[in-house]
């Protein structure tokens, strides 16, 4: 009490001397006062005072983290001269709430539970220099804290992050690292997606084939993807590791759909009896666990029994999403089940399946979470709904009395683009910038006042179809997870400009901790290939206003010049938060963003100076294109000049047949002319392998994953006919079949708002 009174008196006196400063903490605390004129210094007189047994793991972790970068070995003692006191305060109404007092000669962290104390220590760590996150000792650093009082508690009890090790396997070391970092920002649930069509990653001792067969898949080109799995002992270790950091692991076993890896191992649990193969492509599989086979539910119970022995979490996630029911419609056992249970549709059969699985979980002492499709066939009041197809599932669930967790795909799917798809790595097709995440409100207005407390919180999801490794996973998670952490934790504070300022310091922490976070890329160019006649103005900016450079060229003689004094190339050592450039000769412009000594990926745009718009060819009157097809698997177009074509014919346009099978791959070359109606600059895009116009290869997707029209070209074309060559490669590239996207060429003038697809009337021969 004397210490608290002294603190109050010091703050009152200092208010006359200095304005209170902010703290660069994410998420923003509920309430705090800070003054830097007096400080607590870590030294040999510092120690950790921890008298409650349940806090000992938290204290030991804090001591370990402090030692790595400071070299100080803080003892855990009953008393010392400069104590850091950790204490659980049972009077706090929220178990995750904390109060942090920092004096010149003591620190006190009071939490509603061990998790609350841990969160208080994370705020303390963020008040130290960013170098506190380094793994090696940093000499010459001022390891001190400003005197402060911080009072804080969470808005939502469920603050989740989802990871998917089933499309591309993520090693346990990566998952542990994410537990470390998400907990630093007070996220408290790790949703671990353990099974899917493409891989089974949970060891089930009663069914060893699940991991013997379900962890590898044979690709169309004959290569084998060998993933991995987690042993039960490894996962028990992960659970304990996360518990100390205030994180609960919520495991997910997908059913009745997304189960091809399981059916490949145990085909007797499918409607047809197999044979099945682990799915080699992404997307939705039509085969499901058989709802009419009682042995399936014993299979599920056996798996869930072993799962719950590993994971002590209150909730178990059972999936339930994306279940096309055609296979059930054709299955005699499923139809018999429907008749027996008085069910009229397969959607109701899906509801029966989910409710029966929930009964198994209740017998095991657990509660069920499912994706929002579980609402469609009827769900019990005790089920918790994870709303991913927008807000509607969460609204319906909450208003009918079910608990819900909000994770709408347009705001919470971190596998979506966070910058321009022209230059960012391949991602799912949505666009989710940092500011959109920060601006999200998790409780929709359509939820009635009496049901608003049914929203437990929210969650970020990272599906790994286009996440090849752990490094890229971090690139997609951070810093968007920091924005979400503030949305889910901060009670009544939201200021994006202030968040961006705090983010600068936190990004330095990520750098020190070896986290591969996303830096924004320069934006402004509309294409990777741009034609011009005299000169072209280029304005580059980025979403966080960080410095940018353009490499290798800096004068008009070299092709690119600055439009304002003081903006130059990297060699000149000058950067700008907005670059205004003038391109006067053909040149390859490379530019990037830099922050804290770290550079973003480099974007490249080729500016091609032409004397005049490409002249049109002679008048043509016959529609159509010449097509050649060669059968076989072509990883890229390198060998195309030496191919003997199997088919040569005449077609009206680019041909698309959804029934084409990627299991019998082939490559096609279309040649002819395209007609444009006026002389103009035309923006052209396609997901084809290659596109040539007037003998210039303007788009090259050879050997790349092709979707989302990420390659564009801006050409100057004269009114009339222009030669065209298009290459379409019907193969699977990293799980994505080319024929999931129509072989289209899209075009528009600079003035037009929307692209149009070139069709039969546009092509000539």
Give the positions of each predicted feature.
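Flexible, acidic glycine-rich loops studded with aromatic residues
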Residues: 368-373, 378-383, 389-534
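Active-site neighborhood of glycoside hydrolase catalytic domains
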Residues: 277-280, 284-381, 388-396
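Append "Rare intracellular matches occur via the same short Y/T/C beta-strand/loop motifs
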Residues: 550, 581, 587-597, 722-724
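Short, solvent-exposed S/T- and G/P-enriched segments that are highly enriched in secreted/extracellular
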Residues: 535, 552-554, 559-561, 573-587, ...
């Amino acid at each position: 009490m004397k210490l608290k009174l002294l603190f109050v008196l010091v703050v009152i006196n200092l208010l006359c001397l200095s304005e209170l400063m902010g703290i660069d903490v994410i998420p923003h605390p509920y309430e705090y006062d800070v003054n830097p004129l007096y400080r607590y210094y870590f030294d040999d007189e510092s120690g950790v005072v921890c008298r409650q047994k349940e806090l000992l793991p938290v204290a030991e972790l804090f001591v370990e983290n402090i030692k790595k970068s400071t070299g100080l070995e803080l003892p855990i003692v009953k008393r010392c001269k400069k104590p850091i006191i950790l204490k659980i305060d049972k009077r706090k109404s929220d178990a995750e709430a904390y109060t942090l007092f920092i004096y010149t000669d003591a620190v006190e962290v009071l939490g509603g539970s061990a998790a609350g104390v841990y969160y208080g220590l994370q705020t303390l760590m963020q008040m130290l220099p960013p170098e506190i996150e380094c793994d090696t000792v940093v000499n010459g650093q001022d390891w001190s804290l400003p005197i402060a009082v911080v009072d804080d508690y969470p808005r939502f009890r469920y603050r989740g992050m989802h990871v998917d090790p089933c499309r591309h396997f993520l090693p346990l070391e990566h998952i542990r690292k994410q537990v470390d970092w998400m907990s630093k920002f007070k996220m408290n649930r790790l949703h671990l997606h353990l099974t899917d069509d493409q891989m089974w990653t949970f060891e089930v001792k009663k069914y060893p084939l699940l991991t013997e067969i379900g962890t590898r898949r044979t690709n169309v080109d004959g290569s084998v993807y060998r993933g991995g799995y987690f042993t039960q002992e490894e996962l028990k270790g992960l659970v304990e590791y996360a518990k100390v950091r205030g994180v609960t692991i919520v495991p997910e076993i997908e059913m009745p759909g997304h189960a091809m890896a399981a059916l490949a191992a145990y085909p007797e649990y499918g409607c047809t009896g197999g044979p099945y193969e682990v799915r080699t492509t992404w997307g939705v599989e039509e085969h499901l666990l058989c709802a009419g086979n009682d042995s399936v539910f014993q299979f599920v119970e056996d798996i869930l029994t072993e799962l719950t022995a590993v994971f002590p979490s209150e909730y178990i996630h059972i999936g339930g999403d994306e279940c096309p029911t055609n296979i059930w419609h054709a299955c005699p056992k499923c139809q018999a089940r429907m008749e027996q249970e008085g069910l009229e549709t397969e959607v109701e059969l899906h509801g029966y399946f989910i409710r029966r699985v929930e009964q198994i979980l209740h017998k095991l002492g657990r509660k069920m979470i499912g994706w929002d499709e579980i609402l469609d066939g009827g769900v019990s009041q005790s089920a918790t709904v994870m709303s991913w197809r927008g807000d509607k599932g969460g609204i319906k669930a909450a208003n009918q009395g079910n608990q819900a967790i909000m994770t709408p795909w347009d705001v919470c799917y971190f596998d979506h683009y966070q910058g321009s798809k022209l230059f960012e790595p391949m991602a799912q097709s949505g666009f989710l910038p940092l500011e959109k995440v920060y601006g999200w409100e998790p409780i929709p207005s359509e939820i009635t006042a009496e049901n608003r407390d049914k929203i437990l919180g929210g969650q970020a999801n990272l599906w790994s179809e286009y996440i090849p490794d752990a490094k890229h996973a971090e690139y997609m998670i951070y810093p968007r997870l920091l924005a979400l952490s503030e949305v889910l934790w901060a009670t009544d504070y939201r200021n994006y400009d202030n968040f961006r300022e705090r983010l600068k310091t936190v990004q330095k922490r990520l750098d020190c901790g070896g986290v591969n976070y996303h830096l924004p890329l320069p934006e402004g160019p509309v294409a990777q290939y741009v034609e011009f006649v005299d000169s072209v103005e280029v304005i580059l900016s980025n979403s966080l206003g960080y410095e940018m450079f353009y490499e290798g060229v800096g004068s008009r003689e070299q092709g690119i010049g600055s439009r304002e004094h003081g903006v130059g190339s990297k060699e000149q050592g000058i950067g700008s938060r907005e670059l205004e450039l003038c391109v006067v000769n053909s040149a390859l412009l490379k530019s990037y963003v830099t922050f804290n000594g770290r550079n973003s990926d480099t974007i490249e745009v080729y500016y091609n100076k032409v004397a005049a718009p490409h002249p049109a060819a002679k008048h043509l009157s016959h529609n159509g294109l010449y097509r050649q097809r060669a059968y076989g698997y072509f990883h890229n177009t390198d060998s195309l000049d030496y191919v003997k074509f199997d088919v040569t014919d005449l077609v009206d346009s680019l041909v698309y047949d959804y029934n084409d099978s990627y299991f019998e791959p082939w490559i096609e070359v279309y040649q002819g002319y395209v007609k444009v109606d006026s002389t103009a600059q035309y923006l052209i895009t396609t997901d084809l392998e290659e596109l040539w116009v007037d003998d210039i290869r303007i788009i090259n997707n050879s050997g790349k994953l092709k979707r989302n029209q990420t390659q564009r070209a801006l050409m100057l074309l004269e009114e009339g006919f222009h030669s065209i060559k298009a290459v379409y490669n019907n193969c699977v590239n990293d799980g994505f079949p080319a024929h999931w996207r129509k072989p289209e060429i899209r075009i528009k003038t600079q003035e037009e708002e929307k692209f149009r697809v070139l069709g039969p009337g546009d092509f000539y021969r």
